[in-house]
Amino acid sequence: MGDCVLREEKKAEKRQELVDACLDCFVEKGLTVATTKDLCKAAKLQNGGIYYYFSTKEEIVLACAEEAISRIEKAAFGIVFEDISDIKSMTDHLGELADKMSPTMRFLVSVCVSREYGEKVKPSLVRLAARYPYYTGRIAEILGCTDEEVAPFVHLSILAINNYMIFAERALFDPQIEAVKKELSRLAERKGRNNG
C-alpha cells in the first residue's frame, strides 16, 4: 500500500515538472506551433513519452493553462501583499511583473480564445474569479477599510494588469493603474489618520 502511494506521489511530482516544462515550451513556441514532439523534447522525454503522464494533448494544454493562471496569480498577489505598505512601489512592481509575465498571459489568452480549448478552460477561470473576494478582503484588512471600498480598485488593478500583459501597451495600463494608486493611497492615508 505504501509503495503505491509513494509511486503516485512521484508520478504527481513528475507530472508537475512536465507541466512546467510544457508551459515554458508553449510560451516560447505558441499554442498552435508547439508539437507533441516539442513538448517531449522540452520535458526531456522520448517522443510520445508525455502520454505516460497525460492522456491527450488537450489534457496537457489545460494543465498548462491552469499553471499559467497559478503563476500569474501567485506572482501578482505576492507583490501586492509584499509591497502594499508602499502603494507606488507596489504599482511599479506590478508593471514590471506584467512585462515579465506577458508571454505567459498571451499563451493563456490563446487557449481561452481557441475553438478547441476555450470552453474547457472556463472552469479554471471561474475558480480564479472565485478567489478575488479573498484577495479583496485581505487588502481591505491591511488598508483598514471595507471590502466594498477597495473592491473596485482591486478589480481595476486586475483589469489593468491583464490588459497590459495581453496588449503590451503602457497607454492602456498607466491611466488605470494611476487611478488605483491614487485611491489606494487615499484609503491607506485614511487608515493612518484613524490610527494616529
Predicted regions and their residues:
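N-terminal intrinsically disordered/low-complexity leader segments
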Residues: 1-12, 195-196
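Amphipathic, non-transmembrane alpha-helical scaffold segments
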Residues: 11, 15, 19, 61, ...
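Helix-turn-helix
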Residues: 17, 21, 25-59, 63
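Amphipathic alpha-helical interface segments
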Residues: 21, 25, 93, 159-164
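Amphipathic alpha-helical linker/stalk segments
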Residues: 64-90
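Amphipathic alpha-helical packing segments from all-alpha helical-bundle domains
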Residues: 73, 77-78, 100-103, 117-152, ...
